């Protein structure tokens, strides 16, 4: 699984270099794209309040139900944001195919964003580069340092990685969800989004 924003060049590079890998669209960037589609600041805040709770839910069924509900709710107040959300569903929810304990690290590209911030921080010290190659050397040095740090660190423990195998085994033998289970997920989804909107209304009224 490769996680990134939806920049066309990145998406194309992932498909060419990591053939067969799934692609996860960073949900933070997705929420920003939805909010940007709203136009006005007030509507943008409402869009964010509808979308954000979707990715905080802890069960895959509830996340999917909330995603569909968010698309429906956005359709009545901001069709542009609804179109963005609906179009990207398979890529935005790719992380749900992995164990829940992995979700927090898979659904955003925070690791890459931290690397970008470090390059910006180091380049601000220099301010003016004499050539493009000097900038490339600095960025390359930063990435080499990070690669060394990442190679010594364990992102997931062995127990967490074992969960992935167990999850795949259960998925292969899993039963489809009943209508009662689906309705329960829809209820959880509605409660989560409505609670987020109520909190927003209370904060604006205060």
Task: Say what each PLM segment does.
Residues 1-206:
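Catalytic center-proximal scaffold of phosphoryl-transfer enzymes
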